[in-house]
Amino acid sequence: MKIVQAIALAAAVVSTSAVAAGDPAIGKQKGMHCVACHGSENFPGIFPLVQLAGRDPDKLTIKTNKYRTGKLFSPLMSLAVVGLTDKDVDDISAYYNAMGKPYLQMPGIRGDEDIAETAAK
């Protein structure tokens, strides 16, 4: 019986990881509207509120989904996430994570600690 439980647990972990892992190349295409505020590999953003480059994709997914479900509200973000699927969010989060460091380090720009704090709410 314990073997069956161990196999079931391993299968659940593997399937969850496969679903949660996004594709950065697809995320780059789907997240083009995110670049104006959050930047990209070669662009810091017009008014970079939160630079997402190199951020933990799980934290980004959690926070983005809170905007999608209405648990968090922002005039810009709440509109930006309309129509995104779970897969879209995973892909966009993977894209920003794959960038590494932000194009332009800006003092005072919020980062992972803000994302983690808001995601925990």
Spans of features found by a protein language model:
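N-terminal signal peptide c-region/cleavage motif recognized by signal peptidases
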Residues: 15-17
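Amphipathic, hydrophobic secondary-structure cores in small proteins
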Residues: 52-53, 63-79
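Flexible coil segments in periplasmic/lumen-exposed cytochrome c-class electron-transfer proteins
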Residues: 21-31, 40, 72-75, 79-121
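Sec-dependent signal peptide recognition
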Residues: 1-9
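Sequence context surrounding c-type heme c attachment/ligation sites in exported
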Residues: 24-35, 44, 53-62
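Regular, well-ordered alpha-helical segments
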Residues: 36-39, 69
